[in-house]
Curated annotation (Swiss-Prot):
<dbReference type="GO" id="GO:0003743">
    <property type="term" value="F:translation initiation factor activity"/>
</dbReference>
<feature type="domain" description="S1-like">
    <location>
        <begin position="11"/>
        <end position="85"/>
    </location>
</feature>
<comment type="function">
    <text>Seems to be required for maximal rate of protein biosynthesis. Enhances ribosome dissociation into subunits and stabilizes the binding of the initiator Met-tRNA(I) to 40 S ribosomal subunits.</text>
</comment>
<dbReference type="InterPro" id="IPR006196">
    <property type="entry name" value="RNA-binding_domain_S1_IF1"/>
</dbReference>
<keyword id="KW-0648">Protein biosynthesis</keyword>
<comment type="similarity">
    <text>Belongs to the eIF-1A family.</text>
</comment>
<keyword id="KW-0396">Initiation factor</keyword>
<dbReference type="InterPro" id="IPR001253">
    <property type="entry name" value="TIF_eIF-1A"/>
</dbReference>
<dbReference type="InterPro" id="IPR018104">
    <property type="entry name" value="TIF_eIF-1A_CS"/>
</dbReference>
<protein>
    <recommendedName>
        <fullName>Translation initiation factor 1A</fullName>
    </recommendedName>
</protein>
<dbReference type="Pfam" id="PF01176">
    <property type="entry name" value="eIF-1a"/>
</dbReference>
<dbReference type="GO" id="GO:0003723">
    <property type="term" value="F:RNA binding"/>
</dbReference>
<dbReference type="InterPro" id="IPR012340">
    <property type="entry name" value="NA-bd_OB-fold"/>
</dbReference>
C-alpha cells in the first residue's frame, strides 16, 4: 500500500494567556529539587515550583518563558502553570500580550 500523504497541518491550539492571578515570567536559575528562580513581568523575582504533572512531561531550562501563578499567602513564591514554546511566544508578541524587548531584557 502507498504511504498516506500527510501534508495537512495539525489544528493550531490556543496559546494560554495570563488570567487573573497569573503572570508571564522567564526562568533565571535552576535550583534543583524541582525549584527555579523566575523573573516576572511585574518586576519581581520569585522562587517557583514545578508541579508533579509537569516534571517528566515538560522540561524547563534557563531562559524559557513560562506562565506562573504566584501564591496568595506568600507572594515571593509561585507555581509554574505552563511553558511557552518559541512559536507560542511569537503568537503572544503578535497579539501584543508581551513585547519582544521585555522578554529580551528578562532573559539578560
Amino acid at each position: 500500500m502507498p504511504k498516506k500523504d500527510r501534508t495537512d497541518q495539525a489544528p493550531s491550539k490556543d496559546v494560554p494567556k495570563p488570567e487573573e492571578g497569573e503572570v508571564i515570567c522567564v526562568v533565571k536559575k535552576m535550583l534543583g529539587a524541582e525549584h527555579i528562580i523566575i523573573a516576572c513581568l511585574d518586576g519581581k523575582e520569585r522562587t517557583a515550583r514545578i508541579p508533579g504533572r509537569m516534571r517528566k512531561k515538560t522540561w524547563i531550562k534557563e531562559g524559557d518563558v513560562v506562565l506562573a501563578a504566584p501564591w496568595d499567602f506568600q507572594p515571593t513564591k509561585a507555581d509554574i502553570v505552563y511553558r511557552y514554546m518559541n512559536d507560542e511566544i511569537r503568537k503572544l508578541i503578535e497579539e501584543k500580550v508581551i513585547s519582544r524587548d521585555v522578554i529580551d531584557q528578562l532573559r539578560g
